[in-house]
């Protein structure tokens, strides 16, 4: 795929494939992400659907349609402001000890002879942390993972659609049951002027949005640092922060995203009509040689590193500071405990949007 990205950046950085516009270069990807006045994140007719729901024209809808990810200003700004402070440096500082202790406990459960570190570390860590932030029972983490996969992948054969619908209703019911027993941020949402479905969507987004991406960031970092034999250098030169940023660039947890044009738009040499869908390839933009010297090469101390893996503009990922903190602590503690990592088996996430591993089986030797 990356060979195709490289070819398209040179030949057709903005390309129409007969169905959807595709963007490959850093310059135009960033332009689409930043220009919310021309490129909308509302891909589902958010406002129209919400109005129909309130008027009773729609009896049931999926709450995750109604979030800051799928809205434009001014509603987007209102939604984002309600939880911005929980990801502030001051708030995250209070979580560092909890994250480190949780990471050490999870590492204790790993069998160094052979074990799956996606299952034992990369999956549970972000779920446990967001559960604490929201005041939800940590013992329900297995349910959170199942629901997270459901919302992230939205996969299913025709015969499985009914079962998927039942699981989605379970998720909605769970969030409803805990709306009045959460922490300050949950109370803030409950007491806001949002509609009931917006409140549900908001809490569901906070609960699961960062799980898959943080899991992918941790597992991708382990893969990249092992593949390029970088663990010793990262330890000795204390390159954890820069190396994780490079893993974000080189192996982004999210490969692409989509916007919809609000008006006729000129992008590069192409003219895109109003109402067209535009797919921007973050994974391609992150290796654009016009921005990243030796973009196809993994450089653990790369600086500067203006990758787009957490987005750009008003939709820059709200939870990015938390994801970075979790990944840094996970990699630090993992690296301190194990000096040799042998990858035995892997299984990729079956999804062209998310980039990560369902399984990452390793053999480890401790530093003792």
Swiss-Prot record:
Binding site for heme: 76, 80, 257, 259, 315, 317
pH dependence remark: Optimum pH is 8.5 for peroxidase activity.
Compartments it resides in: Cytoplasm
EC class (word): oxidoreductase
CC cofactor note: Binds 1 heme group per subunit.
Principal subcellular localisation of the protein: cytoplasm
Effect noted on mutating residue 214 to V: 3-fold increase in styrene epoxidation activity. 6-fold increase in lauric acid hydroxylation activity. No effect on thermostability
Keyword Cytoplasm: yes
Outcome reported for the amino acid change (mutating residue 213 to F): Loss of styrene epoxidation activity. No effect on thermostability
Catalytic activity: 2 a phenolic donor + H2O2 = 2 a phenolic radical donor + 2 H2O
Keywords noted in UniProt: Cytoplasm, Heme, Iron, Metal-binding, Monooxygenase, Oxidoreductase, Peroxidase
Gene Ontology molecular function, alphabetical: heme binding; iron ion binding; lactoperoxidase activity; monooxygenase activity; oxidoreductase activity, acting on paired donors, with incorporation or reduction of molecular oxygen
GO CC annotations, alphabetized: cytoplasm
Cofactor(s) for this UniProt protein: heme
Temperature sensitivity of activity: Optimum temperature is about 75 degrees Celsius. Activity is 10-fold greater at 75 degrees Celsius than that measured at 25 degrees Celsius. Thermostable up to 85 degrees Celsius. Thermal denaturation midpoint (Tm) is 91 degrees Celsius.
The family this protein is said to belong to: Belongs to the cytochrome P450 family.
Entries under NCBIfam families matching the protein: Cyp119_Thmprot
Function: The endogenous substrate is not known. In vitro, catalyzes the H(2)O(2)-dependent epoxidation of styrene, cis-beta-methylstyrene, and cis-stilbene with retention of stereochemistry. Is able to use cumene hydroperoxide (CHP) or tert-butyl hydroperoxide (TBHP) instead of H(2)O(2) as the electron acceptor. Can also hydroxylate fatty acids such as lauric acid.
Protein name, per record: Cytochrome P450 119
Organism name: Sulfolobus acidocaldarius (strain ATCC 33909 / DSM 639 / JCM 8929 / NBRC 15157 / NCIMB 11770)
